[in-house]
Amino acid sequence: VKIEAGTRKDATMGKAILEELEAVVGEGNVAAAPEEAGGGFLKAGSKNPEWIRVAPGTTEQVQAIVNLARENKIGILTCTNRYALAEDLCRRGILIDFARLNKVERVDTRNLVAHVERGVTWKRLKAALKPLGVKTYAPVAANSSSVVETIVARAVGKGITKFPDYPLMNMKVVLADGDVLKTGTHGFNEAAADGRNEGGPNLSQWHVGADDIFGVVTRASIMLWPVCEARSCLVYGFEEIDEVLKALKEIPRTELGVEYVAINRASLQRLLGGAGDGFPAWSLVVGFEGRQKLVSHNEDRAGRLLEKYDGSRKDSLVPAMTEQLDETWMEASDNHTAFFARFPRVIELDEKVQEAAEAARVGRADVGKILVSVDRGRAVYAVYDWFCEEDCAAALESLNLSLVDLGAFFDRPHGSLGRKIYTGIPNHLPVLRRIKGFLDPENVLNPGRILREEDKAWDPPKVPEGEIGLTVSNLKEVVGKLRACVGEPWVSDNPVDLISHGRDFTVFSGERPNVVILPESTEQVQQIMRIAYEHGIPVVPQTTGFNHGGLTISRKGGILVDLRRMDRVCTVDDEAMTVTVSPAVRMRYVWWEAVKYKATEGVHLKPILPLTLGSVSLLSNYVARGAPGTAAKHGNATEVTVKMTWVLPNGEVFEVGPGAIPGIGNLPIQYCPGPEINGMFFNADGQFGICTELTTKLYPEYDNVVELEELLTGSCLEPDGHKAFCKIVDATYDVARENITEFMYKGHPGAFALGVASKMEGISIKDALNMSPRHPLALMVSGFDAEEIAIKKEILKEILEKHTMYIIDPS
């Protein structure tokens, strides 16, 4: 039964339903009267919807509510923003109010994670964290007073300049069948770890940004940050937006500072109060935190860089803005919009917003603007508020539709904006519909949200009747079709050729495939997939000796798609600091191409590479969810990949990432609009298709990196191996909290010996091994100048000494 809330005659919500709901949540926690059902979720002047509002106090009660709704063919509605979506006001259903689900279950100050229920507000969480010496991230424009709703919605934090990933680890989700899904490593053991990634594909990431269409989130585990010794900021005033944008783009690429937030006069006046006459047109706030000595150094160097722009210091604003850096900023008005954009497009987009405001009779002085530098100056997050009494929803809807055409990326679009964006991405809605179909087959959860009745599901390939599989005659026909597809020289079923494709980088012997084919384009891969399904032949992709995920050759023969000819794409975008590669482009080649490009003056670009061979395909390693050596600073491949092109099993092409939206361009944001479906393709062992192109982030590195980067090794004299290991673990925790290292690696004696022997004449590997510590801790630091490196080394030395460790000096 398909349930479309507000349209079905049999979706009854009578007295019996009210009594059953009260039996679940208790008397007084169900509201059915029209004037009460909307609770605080309606804007002033909104009509009263036909809802039953129910307030559960536990996840188990949410399960019971979902089961009750499904059994009675009633839709479940949730409000993931401050106000209900306009499209939900005309729907009938049970609205879940999470206000009573408000426990801060646990705060883990060692691992910097808080486990909070959905009803916990920002105010409540801040009060709970304050005595513990930790804090949460600070949103620029929170969509909800609920911490969980804000973070699961990927709301942008002020610190997105340095910390571009959203601070979400795990979720507890009530599915449409009433079962509870615990995402990430919580699916195995909540107490052991709070890892975001599952053992295989990141299927549970579907619930991020999904606004509860696949499941109802009731709890989240969120990242925390330590409260540092020093917190400060610089404030510079500017009169022109173009000069502000230069500073927002260029200075973050030096990696000095945490936040880069530009606020116009109208928004600053609303934030701080007062007349605002003394405020500049734009105030650029650059935030710093850490050890006092390091903060003072970085503040001084960033201040020197800011002097070259046409602005002036506004020291009188520093105390107030330093305090504001860690405050939660809500959406500042009911007339609000926000989006990501590439730097070259911001001025045109800003002018469009201004024109629309004037057309809606909103004065120039009443248009609030906030611009945030994203991930070291790759892009901008732009926030706009029209400070007026009138409801400008229609004008903003029209504005947003026009902004998409100019390159604005809205990551959680709804209504007409959502339809324009989702229908513009080939195969996006069919994939979403397919996921919805098996997670919520009866369409109970937020029916009509994102997906509509007319949206077609992804069509799985069908194997026709007749001879299929690994038979002699069938394979002969397949080989003929494959040769017609890519050319005779690039297809072989010769045993001599197949032997070399029967081994891989694992302990398994592998089996020879029946056919090897070497395509050179995405279009040819599409044809191969269609031929394979037409004849019922398994397909396995391979690149540079490493398969996409499983690192194993098919055990049953089939078609091995060798992608080594697809090695022609290696395109660097220095504006967005990204590189786009095809499957066979090797890591060492990406490095040499990237370093040719500048991030800013004195700074070039570099890829972040995993600890593997330079001859390995970058695409294959990233798709296999490889971890770079600098994962402590930059994250894993899932956090740095911004676009992928996949050939699905039915031969259709599916692009994931903002760049898949027509007109957006190469926007380096690591997630799709709406539900985060890109996670399912990572570490999936090729189950969902073949990746033919991938775009990933590059990172800034100083040109004189040899002088401004140093690798240190820490160890201890503790003779007991286990106690020594525990000291290393404790020291690693403390070092990580400082956010000052490029690289942290608890190595082994062999790795240390190889490093020493390669750098010191007259020392053999055997000699180096004899003097190696049992648990070496490799730490790499870099900096703006030699003074910054010296400060960081001093901090590391202090931490290691605290744990009775020392820095090894091989000389």
Model-derived features with residue positions:
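Conserved glycine-rich FAD pyrophosphate-binding loop
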Residues: 3-13, 19, 27, 48-51, ...
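General beta-strand structural signal in soluble alpha/beta enzymes
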Residues: 30-34, 55-56, 76-80, 96-98, ...
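Long, structured ligand/cofactor-binding scaffold of large enzymes
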Residues: 41-134, 146, 150-156, 502-600, ...
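Short, conserved charged micro-motifs
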Residues: 61-64, 124, 241-246, 292-300, ...
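Short beta-strand-to-loop capping motifs
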Residues: 235-240, 286-292, 339-345, 382-389, ...
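Terminal amphipathic helices with adjacent charged low-complexity linkers/tails
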Residues: 260-264, 268-319, 742-775, 780, ...
